[in-house]
Curated annotation (Swiss-Prot):
Disulfide bonds join 36-114, 62-75, 176-183. It comes from Penicillium rubens (strain ATCC 28089 / DSM 1075 / NRRL 1951 / Wisconsin 54-1255). This is Probable cutinase 2. It is an enzyme of class 3 (hydrolase). One of its GO terms (molecular function) is cutinase activity. InterPro entries: AB_hydrolase_fold, Cutinase/axe, CUTINASE_1, CUTINASE_2, Cutinase_monf. It catalyses: cutin + H2O = cutin monomers.
Length: 212
């Protein structure tokens, strides 16, 4: 698929909508800038979404986790090296090496700065590729510290056999809407790819149930 066609197909991420905007008090930089919390949520947003957490599923899950855990959750988005550009979707890993390494570094920072925190994570669209790339690179000890991962509109779903490589399948929940071809190895973006904020509540409950 040439880049011009890819850009046209993915332009829906920038123009379709409106995506429901969820208000959050989180800066999306709470691991880096704040104190350790009992739970740390690391999230990679979709292409073209603004802010470290994006404007849809990321803030929604962050809010739900904070509500469920008495606000004792640090929400951290992947960025600024992860720029969530459209072009990065066409790379072999579905995102940039810089994004994957940045996410890996955030997991490592959570484990080293806050050794007692329980880590949960998520990604939406290109952000799922960030998680698919970063988590397998982590040490076994950090993988054990990750309690659960939720992926919305998983761009690596087919390529990685409906799982994150080298990570327990029972710790992962993948949301693929009916008609979302992105989950089947395509870069064609259609309306179902923008429906995942409706799954945020279920995803948050999945993560909460994985916590001690």
């Amino acid at each position: 698929m040439n880049f011009k066609l890819l850009s046209l197909l993915l332009a829906g991420l920038a123009t379709a909508g409106p995506i429901e905007q969820r208000q959050t008090s989180s800066s999306g930089n709470e691991l880096r800038d704040g104190p350790c919390q009992p739970v740390t949520f690391i999230f990679a947003r979709a292409s073209t979404e603004q802010g470290l957490l994006g404007g849809s599923t990321g803030p929604a899950v962050c809010n739900d986790l904070k509500s469920a855990r008495n606000q004792e959750v640090a929400c951290q988005g992947v960025g600024p090296k992860y720029q969530a550009t459209l072009a990065a979707n066409s790379l072999p890993a579905g995102t940039s090496d810089e994004a994957i390494e940045e996410a890996k570094g955030l997991f490592e920072q959570a484990a080293s700065k806050c050794p007692d925190t329980q880590i949960v994570a998520g990604g939406y669209s290109q952000g799922t590729a960030v998680m698919h790339g970063a988590i397998p690179k982590l040490s076994d000890a950090i993988k054990d510290q990750i309690k659960g991962v939720v992926l919305f509109g998983d761009t690596r779903n087919q390529q990685d056999n409906e799982q994150i490589p080298d990570f327990p399948k029972d710790k992962t929940k993948i949301y693929c809407a009916v008609g979302d071809q992105v989950c089947h190895g395509s870069l064609i973006v259609a309306a179902p790819h923008f429906s995942y904020v409706a799954d945020a509540g279920d995803a948050s409950r999945f993560l909460v149930e994985k916590l001690d």
